[in-house]
A protein has these predicted regions:
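Glycine-rich beta-strand-turn "strand-cap" elements at beta-sheet edges
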Residues: 11, 32-51, 57, 74-103
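Surface-exposed interaction/gating patches
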Residues: 1-17, 98-103
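Residues within well-ordered alpha-helical secondary structure of globular protein domains
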Residues: 21-24, 68, 81-84
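Short amphipathic alpha-helical segments
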Residues: 14-38
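Short amphipathic alpha-helices within nucleic acid-binding modules
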Residues: 16-20, 58-70
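Short, structured motif recognition centered on aromatic/hydrophobic residues
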Residues: 2-6, 18, 30, 49-54
Length: 103
């Protein structure tokens, strides 16, 4: 397995609105292509940030799933709704350590 930690920093004061919008509109779409491990709201460091961790079998699976997601008309319609909330976006890929409960 490979994990993608995707962090979205949103406009100040818009985090709650962003999360509601993402949960109701974005999550049902992207969940067809990726497995959500968890979603967290940062309470320290870079504030107004939400962290999602997504699981994929490997990089090839992630590439394939993201390509399918990008072809989904519902996702294409969702992106313009999401973009005004964003200040910064970052993706980090992680492999579990041998002793990690998440494999």
């Amino acid at each position: 397995m490979i994990y993608e930690m995707r962090t979205y920093q949103v406009q100040p004061g818009k985090a709650g609105e962003f999360l509601k919008m993402y949960q109701s509109k974005g999550l049902p779409i992207i969940s067809r292509y990726a497995k959500l491990i968890g979603c967290w709201v940062k309470e320290s460091g870079v504030l107004n940030s939400t962290v999602f961790i997504w699981a994929y079998e490997d990089f090839a699976h992630r590439t394939s799933q993201r390509a399918q997601l990008m072809q989904d008309p519902a996702w294409s319609a969702f992106i313009p709704e999401m973009l005004p909330y964003l200040v910064h976006q970052e993706s980090v890929f992680m492999n579990p350590a041998a002793f990690s409960p998440a494999k």
